[in-house]
Amino acid sequence: MSHIPISNTIPPKQTDGNGKANISPDKLDPKVSIDMEAPEFKDFAKTMVDFIAEYLENIRDRRVLPEVKPGYLKPLIPDAAPEKPEKWQDVMQDIERVIMPGVTHWHSPKFHAYFPTANSYPAIVADMLSGAIACIGFTWIASPACTELEVVMMDWLGKMLELPAEFLVCSGGKGGGVIQGTASESTLVALLGAKAKKLKEVKELHPEWDEHTILGKLVGYCSDQAHSSVERAGLLGGVKLRSVQSENHRMRGAALEKAIEQDLAEGLIPFYAVVTLGTTNSCAFDYLDECGPVGNKHNLWIHVDAAYAGSAFICPEYRHLMKGIESADSFNFNPHKWMLVNFDCSAMWLKDPSWVVNAFNVDPLYLKHDMQGSAPDYRHWQIPLGRRFRALKLWFVLRLYGVENLQAHIRRHCNFAKQFGDLCVADSRFELAAEINMGLVCFRLKGSNERNEALLKRINGRGHIHLVPAKIKDVYFLRMAICSRFTQSEDMEYSWKEVSAAADEMEQEQ
């Protein structure tokens, strides 16, 4: 075997002409700062705040969809990081030159794709403070305020929605809330908790069965209109998920029960069902008051996914859509979609968090602390270990808007959707593809799917507004979502004119 020679000699220092070590002073002198100093930070931050305010207040004037092609950005910046620090003024100049040409402006009143992602000045300021505190709140002791504010904010939010007391810490029971990153995470966390719960129950009934056998029999359920993240949760959780055929885009209790009984007859073990309140395709609402009791009867974990529509439940007139919530084991919605709280902030409540906590509990010595058990360690409630101080955003928004103004925001968006729907049905060329729910209008040109595909391509190609499509039972349609907090009635008229003009162009070319 060959050996690599090892030298025990210390390489000679580089010296100047006088024999002194030639080392630059800034690498030795602890008094020399390599950081941006506070006065410079203040100037930089003030300039950025001015830029943000100018950007948002005038966002309507920007083309909503960028015209760049993949790879546009690389030629605009150097191939490697700079050796020496640059001036922050140069960075500011590059925002318009490098970044803005490739930004899709989600907060423009002309952006109608997907569902909204929330944005507000109080939330932006809260994120500044969160970034400054820069704690990683995986345990209570890692930053007590981070954990304790989250506990209180989740109770505030739960009370605003009038969730059953069993979900709230203030009830004194087992329940509680946690801020996840996304609804997708919440769905997966609930599935893994349900999986652990059912595994324990079946092992007690059949101690002779091994874990692999039990896991192979587990089956969960969701509507055929459920979000793709539900299917993905099944893949990540290693369990079968069965799609239940919907009726008018909504899952009924009878259909769920039929699917459960079929699987029981085949020797499978039903354990979990997702009930969607506000589907992505058409904002349809599964019958929670039917599906929940069916799940309870068969001892399934019922998870309610209200990612978009859940914000509307702060308005009393929409709470009938969550009828049956008392039958749920977990409930989730995204304040970062429609409640003016910047991404990411996904609110999740569990009636009995212990199933999730025990399923995720890995407790190394370096994460233990003397107060364990006296307050939640949220690392046990989620997939990642680390977590940001997201409760600050909720606290700022709820205090600086108040419930009344948040309700007004929701109602305005719902009214704008009705306005657009009225404009649509007044044109004999168009039809609604689904009932108008919340801030979403599903519409189409009468005729073939191909005509509607061509219409959407033309609308987005014009670049003045941005929409995305959906398809239900082989019917292709366009989705008009009200997304921006800056939206006014005039914006809905403008967006309709864009749709109508695109249809006119198609007719003229025929």
Curated annotation (Swiss-Prot):
Reactions performed catalytically: L-dopa + H(+) = dopamine + CO2; 5-hydroxy-L-tryptophan + H(+) = serotonin + CO2
Alphabetized GO MF terms: 5-hydroxy-L-tryptophan decarboxylase activity; L-dopa decarboxylase activity; pyridoxal phosphate binding
Pfam family, one: Pyridoxal_deC
Protein's UniProt name: Aromatic-L-amino-acid decarboxylase
Key words of the record: Catecholamine biosynthesis, Decarboxylase, Lyase, Pyridoxal phosphate
UniProt-annotated binding residues for substrate: 117, 227
E.C. number: 4.1.1.28
